[in-house]
């Protein structure tokens, strides 16, 4: 019986499952009515670590009997073949499976298929309700075998301790509130958790408080057993940097982007040496609209490009100290970024949508290129996301589900 199998595999499941698979299981079990909304919320909110969530989830389902347990097992076999291999599970058709799905003649589609169809029917925004596509084990192995020296290695899910930091400022003493930013915060946190990161969230900080949080994050011992990290900053911004909550024309409460790089570089954060460090910034970088009226001829002076800044004496040294970074900003320098009061930021929405859709098959820089392409012919306001200070030396595949 499936419930007995699940109990027998309990310890292995707790030690091996990723947070992405846990979240997928919760969605599947809610959809199949194995769990109700209250049970799902309790598992998510009452447990801090992924292992605690896994333990609570496994115990909940096994107590509900063989039918519920079979749905649990079938999902793992279909959506996380790597975990299924570790647990030695098989999703062979059985009477138990069909009892749970008899109200659908064609059988239930996967949770991702169901959600995609639901999005088309109810008009919800893609990217907010989409599902992260997992990378099949065969695809991950193929990518790795083809170019092992050109891809950043990932650590085993059972031992790695990935961390991510989100700083989101929504309320300010002298600036307007960032209406809709809570959507960005919620969706970005869920995405990073699905990708296997434990997410630290900090809200409404001054520049000094942001510096303190980044320094503490850089010093976290978990980075030693992690293969990468994400830092996400969402706030008002100006050309000089990211606004703290007390910023005004009289109070220069600004976190410079350069300061973030300095706090996370090899000298200050040696635990992340040779590991990808991704910085996402949703903030204006000026007050310009990011659009010009085109004319048939434009004079470009060669001198405009041959500035001293390109030929810094210590460039080689910086490349070694500041390595394996990529920053993705919501707009080009000097220009504004746009935010919808219901949907959230256009940049964050597009980024999450493309990460969910393509992370299983594309490296991060390719995903960022797809995000930029989505802004090439804008439907609403004009802005163009840009990658800054890219020192990645290899391709960074996220391999969702692994």
Swiss-Prot record:
SMART domains noted in UniProt: CARD, CASc
One GO biological process term: protein autoprocessing
GO CC terms of this entry: AIM2 inflammasome complex; canonical inflammasome complex; cytoplasm; cytosol; extracellular region; IPAF inflammasome complex; microtubule; mitochondrion
Sites bearing Omega-N-methylarginine, chain numbering: 343
Domain CARD: 1-91
Reactions catalysed, as given in the entry: Strict requirement for an Asp residue at position P1 and has a preferred cleavage sequence of Tyr-Val-Ala-Asp-|-
Enzyme Commission numbers on file: 3.4.22.36
Variant or mutagenesis effect after changing residue 316 to N: Mediates autoprocessing but are unable to mediate cleavage of Gasdermin-D (GSDMD)
Active site: 236, 284
Tissue: High level expression seen in spleen and lung, low level expression seen in brain, heart, liver, kidney, testis and skeletal muscle.
Enzyme class: hydrolase
Gene3D superfamilies linked to this entry: 3.40.50.1460, Death Domain, Fas
Keywords, alphabetical: Apoptosis, Cell membrane, Cytoplasm, Hydrolase, Membrane, Methylation, Phosphoprotein, Protease, Thiol protease, Ubl conjugation, Zymogen
Reported consequences of knocking out the gene: Mutants are resitant to vaccinia virus (VACV) but not vesicular somatitis virus (VSV) infection. They show lower viral loads in the lungs compared to wild type mice, they produce higher levels of type I IFN, IL6 and RSAD2/Viperin after VCAV INFECTION.
Record PTM text: The two subunits are derived from the precursor sequence by an autocatalytic mechanism. Ubiquitinated via 'Lys-11'-linked polyubiquitination. Deubiquitinated by USP8.
Quaternary context: Heterotetramer that consists of two anti-parallel arranged heterodimers, each one formed by a 20 kDa (Caspase-1 subunit p20) and a 10 kDa (Caspase-1 subunit p10) subunit. May be a component of the inflammasome, a protein complex which also includes PYCARD, CARD8 and NLRP2 and whose function would be the activation of pro-inflammatory caspases. Component of the AIM2 PANoptosome complex, a multiprotein complex that drives inflammatory cell death (PANoptosis). Both the p10 and p20 subunits interact with MEFV. Interacts with CARD17P/INCA and CARD18.
Chain's role: Thiol protease involved in a variety of inflammatory processes by proteolytically cleaving other proteins, such as the precursors of the inflammatory cytokines interleukin-1 beta (IL1B) and interleukin 18 (IL18) as well as the pyroptosis inducer Gasdermin-D (GSDMD), into active mature peptides.
Positions carrying Phosphoserine: 301
Family per record: Belongs to the peptidase C14A family.
Protein name, per record: Caspase-1
Positions of the propeptide removed during maturation: 1-118, 297-314
Residue ranges with Basic and acidic residues bias: 113-123
């Amino acid at each position: 019986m499936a419930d007995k199998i699940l109990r027998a595999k309990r310890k292995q499941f707790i030690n091996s499952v990723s947070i992405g698979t846990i979240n997928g299981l919760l969605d599947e079990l809610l959809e199949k009515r194995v769990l109700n909304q209250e049970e799902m919320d309790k598992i998510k909110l009452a447990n801090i670590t992924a292992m605690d969530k896994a333990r609570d989830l496994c115990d909940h389902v096994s107590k509900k009997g063989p039918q519920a347990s079979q749905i649990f097992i079938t999902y793992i076999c279909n959506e996380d073949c790597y975990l299924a291999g570790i647990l030695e599970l098989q999703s062979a058709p059985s009477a138990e499976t069909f009892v749970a799905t008899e109200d659908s003649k064609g059988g239930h589609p996967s949770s991702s298929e169901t959600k995609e169809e639901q999005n088309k029917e109810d008009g919800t925004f893609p990217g907010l309700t989409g599902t992260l596509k997992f990378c099949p084990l065969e695809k991950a192995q193929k990518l790795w075998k083809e170019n092992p020296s050109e891809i950043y290695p990932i650590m085993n899910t059972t031992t790695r301790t990935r961390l991510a930091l989100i700083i989101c400022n929504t309320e300010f003493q002298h600036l307007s509130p960032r209406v809709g930013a809570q959507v960005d915060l919620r969706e970005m946190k869920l995405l990073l958790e699905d990708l296997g990161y434990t997410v630290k969230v900090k809200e409404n900080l001054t520049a000094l408080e942001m510096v303190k949080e980044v320094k503490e994050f850089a010093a976290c011992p978990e980075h030693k057993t992690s293969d990468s990290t994400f830092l996400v900053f969402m706030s008002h911004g100006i050309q000089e940097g990211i606004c703290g909550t007390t910023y005004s024309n009289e109070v220069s409460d600004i976190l410079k982007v350069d300061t973030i790089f300095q706090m996370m570089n090899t000298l200050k954060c040696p635990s992340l040496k040779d590991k990808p460090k991704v910085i996402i910034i949703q903030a204006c970088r000026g007050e310009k609209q990011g659009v010009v009226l085109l004319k048939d001829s434009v004079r470009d002076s060669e001198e405009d490009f041959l500035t001293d800044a390109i030929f810094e004496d210590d460039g080689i040294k910086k490349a070694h100290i500041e390595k394996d970074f990529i920053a993705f900003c919501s707009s080009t320098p000097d220009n504004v970024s746009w935010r919808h009061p219901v949907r959230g930021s256009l940049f964050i929405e597009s980024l999450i949508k493309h990460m969910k859709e393509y992370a299983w098959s594309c490296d991060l820089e390719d995903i960022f290129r797809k995000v930029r392409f989505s802004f090439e012919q804008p439907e609403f306001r004009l802005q163009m996301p840009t990658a800054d200070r890219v020192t990645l030396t290899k391709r960074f595949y996220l391999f969702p589900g692994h």
